[in-house]
Amino acid sequence: MFSSITASQILINLNGNSIDNLSGLINFDNTIYKTIEKTYKLSSFNLDLDQSNLVKNIKLNSSIANIELTGKYNLSTLPDAFMQYLNEYFPTFVKTKTRYIYNDKADLNVKIKNFSIVNELFVKDLMVSPSSLVNCSFDASINYLNIKTTSDVISYAGVKFKNNDILVNSLTNGIKLIYNATAINLSDSLAFRNPTLVFTANDKISDFDLNWDNKLSPKNAGVISG
């Protein structure tokens, strides 16, 4: 498929000799992405990297999303640090490549502004409403992960999830996920109202509680545990 990217202004000003100390600015203004079917206006794209100090900060501002990564980390070791975290809770399924103990610590914040371009170009089954938020804190040295997400509407393969809140937290007995919403619409006529899911996993052991209640008459409610 033919495609092209054009920008009226391109600014690249970077210093450093590795991905872990690269600092500076990358800016694209009035960016246009063209395919045979459609032209997409991406507006501005600004990537600001400050990795010259112990506490690093990377900011991405675009018409699609704003993303910020802050903390004491190395981009080259963050993936291995996360695998180390997963190995602590799921040693049967996740193996580490080394005995080295990573100490990467980072906070990630994401705000969705316009997901439609990503939806049309890359993930046609997934749509996320504007102002959706993801806030994540990670500390490999103490095997800690906390994730909070909020979104008015998430659509996947025709199923709509409304007023979503997700919390993921590290516990001594595993990783716990709590999901709350006002509705999961499977179709125009079928919906689960006020669903709540609590899921805990630790290696081969897991348990969950799923319940919903439409709080209307006729009543549609249920509880599933396992």
Give, region by region, the residue ranges found by the protein language model:
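Surface-exposed, low-complexity/disordered segments
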Residues: R99-Y100
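Hydrophobic lipid-interacting interfaces of membrane-associated proteins
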Residues: M1-D80, N87-K95, L108-G226
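Short structural boundary motif marking the start of a folded domain
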Residues: D104-A106
